[in-house]
Each structure stands twice: as structure tokens, then as C-alpha cells.
């Protein structure tokens, strides 16, 4: 009888405790995609050339899944070159060819495999930068058909990244007149509804971006967001790599609800060689949502590398996150 009573008492205590926890959770402010701050990598695929090279090329990244698993990277940047055989290859340029994933398919598949095994991760931000081959002859200069290249990229995203694991402009717009109005009036999707997914962003401006907008007016039906211009109907995600000089502008965008990518360093600019964290600290303080680096982990001979303060590995955004945000609420894959 004692055992039965004790068991009943314990059960009652657990029930009351669970009720209390549930009530506390209900009182918490719901977290959204723009309430986070993550580490990103610049040219995430990059491997330094073998042999002597210039400083700008002299850095290497681990495979994308290792970056996600061991270094806490949640934002990636992939340069894509179109090949006449129809393949989309990934490398920096013809003088800097080495890559830890050779094709866009391989890069996406590597990240997707990790994502499927860690489905509570915050959304990946995957920036795709199309590169333009210019073929020269004595008579003319021919630029590869950009529209076809963009469509090839779009189709590979469709083929190699499932729709139910993709956050698209249509998902964010959700009936609003424009994408920009959806963000400023309704906000980004809830973080808990967005875990295990990815957002793709076209890292380009000018004619290339215009061509994409012509194909997908207002980004209706598109898989990718575009690098925005302030005030445009497509405005959602911005890239500003100068958090020192443009800190006020970045912070204003963050406060308005937009997502901003920035940079902590650039190999040839000397931050890593001089262990200079000024740019990193500026990017953190103005609320950049992703902070891209060439050095996401310690490297022999260099004292500099990037960590997001209080990140688990992802942190609460210091500008946009609600006061009751904690790193554990943002992401805790180890639990």
C-alpha cells in the first residue's frame, strides 16, 4: 500500500510539475527566424591552393557538414559556375579552383544529410553566388546566358533540397501584398516552425538580380530570396559587409525586422593576421543575423577565429530578440 501511495504521490507531483513548466512555456515570447545570430563562412567550399599563393586565397574550410557539426556554422556561401555540359560547379575562380564539394549537387546533398540527422537546427541561410564566364575571341565577347544559369540553379535547389525543408518567399509573404510588407507588418515565421529547414538567397545585384525578378515578379513562386534594395517590394534579406562604417544602417534594418548578413573578416584585410576583432565586434553589436568569416575555428599559426558570444552555438540577436530569449531556446542539438 505504501508503494502504491508513494507512486501515486510521485505521479501527482510530476503532473503538477509538468503543468507548471507548460504554463511557463506558454508565457514565453515566441521566437522568430530574425531573433537569432549565427556564425557563417565566406566561400564555404574553399580549399587553399596547393603551393605558394596570394593571401586572399590562403585559407581552407572543412567539409560543410563538419562546419555545421563541429564549428556551429549555420550560414553558408557557395559560388556557382555553369559548365557547357550543363553541370553547376563550385569553386572561386580559374586561379583558385580547389573546393571541398565539387558541384552544387554535392554541396546541397552534404548539408541535407546533416540536416536530416539534426532536424532541430535553426534554418540554414545558404547564399548562392552565380559566377559569369566571359569567353573572349578576336571578334566578340560572349557572356553565358544568365537566365538559363539562374534557372539551372533554381532547378537544382528544387531537385536536391526538399520543398518541405525550404523556407521560400511565398512562405514568408503568406497572403500579404508584398514580401517587404509581410516582414514589417507580420514578421518572419516562427523559429520552431522553421527548424531543420533552409533559406536560399541569390548573392548578386544588377542585371543578374533583375533577370531573376523578371522571371519571378515579387519573388512569387521562387525558391530563392534576393539580396535586397531598401524600399523594394522584395526586401527581406540584406548583405552589408562593413559593420563598422555602416553599423547604423545595419541596426536600423534589423530593428525594422529585416535579416542582415555581414562579415567579420577578409583574409587579405588583415583581421586574422593581426588578431583584430574590431569588425567582428561591430557586426555582433549591431545585430547582424549572420556573421561570415574565413576562420570559423582555430588554425595553426593564427590566434584569430570567430565564435558567437553566448552561442549554443547559435545566440539570441542582441537587437531583435525578445528579452526572454536564451541560447538554449534558440538551439540545443545536444539535448
Q: Over which residues does each language-model region extend?
A:
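Secretory targeting signatures
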Residues: 1-22
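Catalytic cores of phosphodiester-bond hydrolases, prominently lipid phosphodiesterases
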Residues: 21-335
Amino acid at each position: 500500500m505504501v508503494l502504491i501511495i508513494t507512486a501515486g504521490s510521485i505521479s501527482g507531483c510530476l503532473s503538477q510539475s509538468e503543468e507548471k513548466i507548460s504554463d511557463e512555456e506558454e508565457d514565453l515570447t515566441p521566437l522568430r527566424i530574425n531573433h537569432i545570430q549565427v556564425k557563417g563562412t565566406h566561400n564555404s567550399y574553399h580549399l587553399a591552393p596547393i603551393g605558394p599563393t596570394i593571401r586572399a586565397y590562403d585559407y581552407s574550410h572543412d567539409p560543410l557538414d563538419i562546419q555545421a557539426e563541429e564549428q556551429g556554422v549555420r550560414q553558408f556561401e557557395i559560388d556557382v559556375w555553369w559548365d557547357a555540359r550543363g553541370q553547376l560547379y563550385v569553386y572561386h575562380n580559374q586561379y583558385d579552383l580547389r573546393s571541398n564539394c565539387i558541384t552544387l549537387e554535392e554541396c546541397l546533398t552534404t548539408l541535407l544529410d546533416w540536416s536530416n540527422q539534426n532536424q532541430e537546427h535553426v534554418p540554414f541561410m545558404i547564399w548562392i553566388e552565380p559566377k559569369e564566364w566571359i569567353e573572349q575571341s578576336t571578334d566578340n565577347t560572349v557572356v553565358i546566358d544568365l537566365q538559363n544559369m539562374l534557372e539551372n540553379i533554381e532547378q537544382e535547389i528544387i531537385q536536391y533540397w526538399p520543398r518541405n525543408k525550404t523556407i521560400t518567399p511565398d512562405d514568408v509573404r503568406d497572403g500579404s501584398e508584398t514580401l517587404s510588407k509581410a516582414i514589417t507588418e507580420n514578421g518572419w515565421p516562427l523559429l520552431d516552425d522553421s527548424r531543420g529547414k533552409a533559406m536560399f538567397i541569390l548573392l548578386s545585384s544588377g542585371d543578374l538580380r533583375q533577370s531573376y525578378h523578371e522571371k519571378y515578379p515579387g519573388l512569387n513562386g521562387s525558391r530563392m530570396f534576393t539580396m535586397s534594395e531598401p524600399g523594394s517590394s522584395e526586401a527581406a534579406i540584406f548583405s552589408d559587409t562593413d559593420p563598422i562604417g555602416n553599423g547604423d544602417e545595419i541596426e536600423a534594418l534589423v530593428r525594422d525586422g529585416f535579416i542582415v548578413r555581414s562579415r567579420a573578416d577578409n583574409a587579405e584585410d588583415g583581421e586574422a593576421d593581426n588578431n583584430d576583432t574590431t569588425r567582428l565586434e561591430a557586426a555582433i553589436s549591431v545585430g547582424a543575423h549572420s556573421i561570415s568569416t574565413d576562420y570559423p575555428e582555430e588554425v595553426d599559426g593564427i590566434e584569430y577565429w570567430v565564435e558567437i558570444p553566448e552561442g549554443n552555438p547559435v545566440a539570441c540577436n542582441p537587437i531583435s530578440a525578445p528579452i526572454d530569449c536564451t541560447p538554449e531556446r534558440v538551439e540545443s542539438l545536444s539535448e
